């Protein structure tokens, strides 16, 4: 099982869709070697070095956290059922209300739309918020996602810069 890495006072909580099999086997988030999460958050400015999946707890040192919409591991996120995403969205709102990070970054547009019953959303900052927490939708860093790493970094850096502009 891949546990959440959460604490009060975080700049951002990154929310993946669900654990892949590599993460489920190791217990660490974003553990598959092809997953670009750790590289992208470093290059975007969230960490001062590229962490390894087994160093996930160190995210807290950078005021970052990690959670997921669905606990059940799958080979591909497309295997996650709509009812799981909807339930996960409700659970995620409760977590965010409890921890109150400055921002929530949901990693995947379709997962966000299904988990939060939204339609036709754009990438980036959303109109909805959870209390004082800004909600962002960023591209998923999975190696199965064809988006180029440079575009991922650009999208994640936009969030980092928005937080810096708010003094966070």
From Swiss-Prot:
Compartment(s) of residence: Cytoplasm
Enzyme nomenclature, EC number: 3.2.2.28
GO terms of molecular function: DNA binding; pyrimidine-specific mismatch base pair DNA N-glycosylase activity; uracil DNA N-glycosylase activity
Catalysed reactions listed for this entry: Specifically hydrolyzes mismatched double-stranded DNA and polynucleotides, releasing free uracil
Enzyme class: hydrolase
One term under GO cellular component: cytoplasm
BP terms from Gene Ontology: base-excision repair, AP site formation
Keywords: Cytoplasm, DNA damage, DNA excision, DNA repair, DNA-binding, Hydrolase
PANTHER family referenced in this protein's UniProt entry, alphabetically: G/T AND G/U MISMATCH-SPECIFIC DNA GLYCOSYLASE, G_T MISMATCH-SPECIFIC THYMINE DNA GLYCOSYLASE
Function text: Excises ethenocytosine and uracil, which can arise by alkylation or deamination of cytosine, respectively, from the corresponding mispairs with guanine in ds-DNA. It is capable of hydrolyzing the carbon-nitrogen bond between the sugar-phosphate backbone of the DNA and the mispaired base. The complementary strand guanine functions in substrate recognition. Required for DNA damage lesion repair in stationary-phase cells.
Sequence similarity: Belongs to the uracil-DNA glycosylase (UDG) superfamily. TDG/mug family.
Assembly behavior: Binds DNA as a monomer.
Listed name of the protein: G/U mismatch-specific DNA glycosylase
Organism: Salmonella arizonae (strain ATCC BAA-731 / CDC346-86 / RSK2980)
This protein's encoding gene: mug
